[in-house]
Regions:
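Short, well-ordered loop/turn elements at secondary-structure boundaries
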Residues: 3-6, 14, 27, 42, ...
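Active-site palm subdomain of RNA-directed nucleic acid polymerases
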Residues: 59-105, 109
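Polymerase palm active-site segment centered on the conserved acidic dipeptide of motif C
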Residues: 11, 95-128
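Conserved pre-motif C helix in the palm subdomain of viral-like polymerases
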Residues: 4-9, 15-18, 43-78
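Mobile genetic element proteins and their domesticated derivatives, centered on retroelements
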Residues: 13, 33, 54, 66, ...
Length: 128
């Protein structure tokens, strides 16, 4: 809880994080399920195309996607990437800054990095 060491806390949550992770076509058979619509006699076999919240592997998949994306930004924004890495837990960022201006700078930098992959964040600034 590094954010508690600063007067301004920054918490961010990737909106619909698990739905952002697309499963390769070759791997979708492992996410197969059967569906029967009302009034229909036949059972359909369908496959999920996105990572599901609640599967054991989902947090691992999301973590890999986020880490790979951060690696691609490490050369351009090394300080920001280091800050995000040490403050990120699965899809939640918990950090803090001494001033509101620095907290907003962290927020804007995070948006810039993650918008390239269409990750959307829910942000909160709190004064401790």
């Amino acid at each position: 809880m590094r954010m508690r060491f600063h007067p301004v806390a920054v918490t961010e949550d990737i909106k619909q994080a698990f739905l952002q992770v697309r499963i390769k076509k070759a791997e979708r058979d492992s996410l197969r399920f059967h569906w029967k619509s009302s009034g229909q006699l036949e059972v359909e076999t369908l496959r999920f195309t996105r990572a599901l919240f609640g599967l054991v592997c989902s947090t691992f998949l999301l973590g890999g996607v986020v880490e790979r994306h951060l690696e691609s930004w490490e050369g351009r924004e090394p300080g920001l990437v280091a800050e995000v890495r040490k403050s990120l837990y699965v899809h939640d960022l918990l950090s803090g800054k001494p001033t509101v201006a620095e907290a907003k700078e962290l927020k804007e930098g995070t948006i810039k990095v993650f918008m390239k992959r269409n990750f959307r964040f829910l942000f909160y600034l709190r004064f401790l």
